[in-house]
Amino acid sequence: MTYASNSCVISLIKSYLLRFIVTCSIPFLFLGCSSQDSANTDGQGSTTGSKPVVFVPISPYQFIFEKIAGDLIDIKVIVGEGDDPHSYSPTPKQIVDMAKANLLCSGELGFESNYFVKLGDGKTGPLELNLLEKLDLLEGHCDHPSHKTEDPNDDLDHDHEDLNDPHVWLSPTTLMVQSDQIAKKLKELLPKDSESIIDTNLENFKKDLSEIHAELGELLKPDSGKKFYVYHSAFAYFAQDYSLEQIAIEIGNKSPTPKQSAKIAEQAKKEEVKVIFVQPQFDQTSAKALAESINGRVAKIDPLEKDIVANLREIATAIKSSL
């Protein structure tokens, strides 16, 4: 075979090989494009041009963000319905998704210490918003370990020091301050032409809060100074707003000892308490035992209901009926 013939054969083989490679590569090219499109998130947890993704710890905060931002953002709730936020552990998928988000909100509910997400500027990593910023916080209990401020060189036990009560969403007055901080962060996150929408929504939401605060103030005014008994101490800010006092059965995120239960029961009998309030996320055994010992009953109030305004009314009505 001549050199020219060899060249023709080689050219023909190259031609067939090229066609084969191109044909086989087409599906992978499309797959690659699809993968690239799905991964084209600008580091923000959502595809380019879509809504910014915001993670909030519990559904009441979802309600606030929806009221202020409307449909400008995509809101994800970390702790699901029926779960206890104090002991919740996010799934691996949730942690991956949070790392891709635009904004990650923390409420110092305890479970935030169960994961780590590298923060950023909203593009290379999520912005952070501490939902307790600018608030006049009440002292909490050792079931909320996310805000300890102890000296790492100090060997003493400080389990009960410098802890904040995180249940701030159950107070209209603290919600107003929170709403301002949320609106400020949303303006940082969203385009400038969204500011007027945020301002209008914020004004309307604060009006709703002001109205419910006035309504509940009138409802509970005759009961000023009275006590109500709860299993979990989630209602201190609510009590503060309306000059009430909550008495918690749970001590340091644990059921009371028999001795402690006896002391609480004795106090409840003296104060003629007939209702022990429980929330569905917690074991109710101790509360039911206490209720039986005082010839009372348990009643449910759920601090984690999404619609804060409606829930505040329900909580107030339930407490009012027990006083």
Question: Where are the predicted features?
Answer:
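N-terminal secretory signal peptides that target proteins for export/translocation
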Residues: 1-15
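Bacterial N-terminal signal peptides
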Residues: 12, 16-30
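Extracytoplasmic metal-acquisition and chelation regions
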Residues: 3, 33-323
